[in-house]
Amino acid sequence: VFQDIINPNSPKITQVVNAGQISVIKPNVAHTMVFTKDTTFLNLVRGERDHENYGITHTIKHVFVDEKEKKLLLENYKFDCRSCGNTDLKRVVSLGYQPLANNLLNKKNDKCELYPLEVNFCAKCYNCQLSISVDPKKMFSNYLYTSSTSKIFRNHFVEAAKKYMKELKLDKKKSYIIDIGSNDGVALKPFLDLGLKKVLGIEPAKNLAKLANKNKIKTFNGFLEKKNLKKIKKNADLILASNVFAHSDKLKEMTECMLSMLGKKGTIIIEVQYLMNTLKDLTFDNIYHEHYNYWSLTSLTNFFNQFDAIIFRAEKVDTHGGSLRIYIK
């Protein structure tokens, strides 16, 4: 963990140093090391630290990482790629330590927790992911963002429902649709309005699941994980996941669950922020702790190949500053 102490606006940055690698620290950079396993460490610093000015004019002792932060790094740092398991990750973006999105303070003197906000890149499968995985219960148990408040999103899902009904030849009486991370039911409501009878939302935020059920959009409150599968009706004709693949820390388990719920002739349609647009348009504000992953079509293809699932169509959509919509069998 290091930070330039000359520049007052410099961020605190983390960096993983794997076995056999050399870490070079520039002058005037405060730094400390958090060892994740028993390690033989060789310090190549020149000169003795116990000199006459030690602790007076330079080499001043400073608690740069306290016990709480050390525990956070040890427990929540993601050392391997969520997609392929590769451990050789390279940091490509650091926005320093930041609070959780929408975590607004009620009082001037209130304090909020800060977490590293950094993107690491996997050169093996081209996945991009955050360095720290914040506990999802802290972010999603009482989620503040309701998708239906946005007219743009409401219209987006209305048009999407019409498109899927026509292209996939969905039957109003028989077809069964599941929406993962369904929020307040914004993506399922248009199907009900079109006369489709069987829908199910899966939403971890209690407040949003309660709101959806109140509006007669059947919703299961919980994460999509194997322990919950027995509570969910399967054989779906269509499974939707809009921006969910950005929000999931347990990608492989979630994907296995989705495939197990899909009917033989069913289709999975995923919408996710498009990394190419983030890079091209410099939309760094789309990088925040809820978005564990940042996808390109190549990295999505590499990911789904592991499950013998095929992306048979991909198209660009305008949501979230530019997104991908992919169709999977």
Over which residues does each language-model region extend?
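N-terminal juxtadomain amphipathic helix
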Residues: L74-I152, E315
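Conserved class I S-adenosyl-L-methionine
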Residues: K173-N183
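A conserved beta-strand element that flanks and buttresses the S-adenosyl-L-methionine
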Residues: L240
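A short glycine-rich, Lys/Arg-flanked "PGG" loop and its adjoining helix->strand segment in the class I
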Residues: K252-T267
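Short, glycine-/aromatic-enriched active-site segment of Class I SAM-dependent methyltransferases
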Residues: I270-N293, L297-S299
